[in-house]
Regions:
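Short, structured segments at the rim of ligand-binding sites
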Residues: 1-378
Length: 378
């Protein structure tokens, strides 16, 4: 694949007639779960192939069973061994695929599998999350007919063969990035405007903050560059320590039924500046809530009730510290927020976990008034 960065942070990709899977960067592939999504697209070009084990954030046991069960419906067999997934393909077209769980990557995988299959496939218990919608919008521009985008049932009519079409597409903005900056503003009692927020993936989050007492202004909706996603600009006002803890627990759910699962962690520093005690229930992952307790190192009064629930007492006077990042993106970025809210100089080590999820984060935070220096410690 020819990859070329263009001015304006655009990326041009050109696929060759034949892919060289033996040249795949295995070390890079093992650092992320996105390598799993190669199966749904490569199954149309190869009778057998292998890809490296999927990696990503260390959040406890993360099964690939949903991918395996759904891809089996398309005639795909997956066996694990010697650090790789070994894939075999005997194509068949299912009329209906019921997902074992409503996950983002498994939905994307199955949508791509259906996109080049003959006929129509109905996908039930699909994720309607923002990244799934972007994949669907992209495939629509390539000629794939997809109905039900944003819902839990997708109807995909494949193009039956290779797709050879030049297109330009702009992925929508990331609501999790927006949540990071909003959480930072609240934890540091700052007044900032976060522009181009995908509001459909932030509505309940903003309602929760409203009932905490946060004051904010929101512009009318306008469209993202993809012509589909609704955006707003949100201006966060200083709260001056007047926020109150919610009586009800704060927990995530599968979109569109609740708070986004990757937005939930950013309620930890928000709860820390609220008056009162907050219960956060992170039921999705086996041990992500355990990583939240690292926030005690920067002064947060946090109590681990069990591997999924933490109680946070506030308000908090954050303190400086020298801390190593946990091996999970969102919990690691919480420590950065706490350090920005603390007086004095803190050190956050092994920041690769954060860097792989947020581009030029230190520079952007410095433009808002933070003082962050990235250095190599040999």
């Amino acid at each position: 694949v020819q990859a070329k960065w263009l001015p304006g942070n655009d990326l041009e990709l050109k696929r060759p007639e034949e892919l060289r899977l033996d040249r795949l960067d295995k070390e890079a592939a093992r650092k992320t779960r996105s390598v799993l999504m190669m199966i749904g697209s490569l199954m149309h070009d190869y009778d057998s192939f292998k890809i490296p084990y999927a990696g990503g954030c260390k959040l406890g046991a993360r099964t690939v069973a949903p991918h395996l069960f759904a891809l089996e419906e398309f005639g795909v067999g997956i066996k694990a061994g010697n650090g790789n997934y070994h894939i075999t393909v005997e194509k068949k077209l299912p009329e209906r695929v019921v997902l074992y769980e409503s996950g983002d990557t498994v939905t994307e995988n199955i949508v791509m599998a259906a996109a080049r299959s003959t006929g129509e496939t109905i996908i039930q218990f699909a994720s309607g999350n923002y990244m799934v919608q972007d994949v669907c919008f992209f495939l629509q521009k390539l000629g794939v007919k997809i109905e039900g985008i944003g819902s839990t049932t997708l109807r995909v009519r494949g193009v039956n063969g290779p797709i050879k079409k030049n297109i330009t597409y702009a992925p929508a903005e990331d609501p999790i990035e927006a949540m990071f900056f909003i959480s930072t503003a609240i934890a540091t009692n700052s007044e900032i405007t976060v522009e181009r927020v995908p509001i459909d993936f932030m509505t309940l989050e903003m309602l929760k903050r409203k009932h905490m007492g946060l004051k904010f202004d929101m512009t009318p909706r306008y469209k993202a560059a993809n012509g589909q996603t609704d955006l707003v600009d949100i201006h966060i006002h200083k709260h001056n320590g007047e926020l109150k803890a919610l009586v009800e627990k704060i927990h995530a759910n599968v979109y569109p039924a609740g708070i986004n699962q990757d937005n939930l962690p950013y309620f930890v520093p928000i709860a820390a500046v609220c008056k009162g005690r907050t219960l956060i229930n992170d039921w999705t992952y086996e041990n992500r809530a355990i990583y939240y307790t690292e926030m005690s190192k920067v002064g947060v009064n946090i109590e681990l009730a069990d591997p999924h629930r933490v109680f946070i007492g506030g308000p908090t006077k954050f303190n400086r510290d020298d801390v190593v990042c946990p091996p999970a993106l969102r919990p690691a970025s919480l420590l950065l927020i706490g350090m920005m809210a603390a007086e004095g100089v803190s050190t956050l080590r092994n920041i690769y976990t954060i860097q792989r999820g947020y581009e030029d984060l230190a520079e952007r935070l410095n433009s808002l008034g933070a003082h962050i220096e990235v250095f190599q410690d040999f």
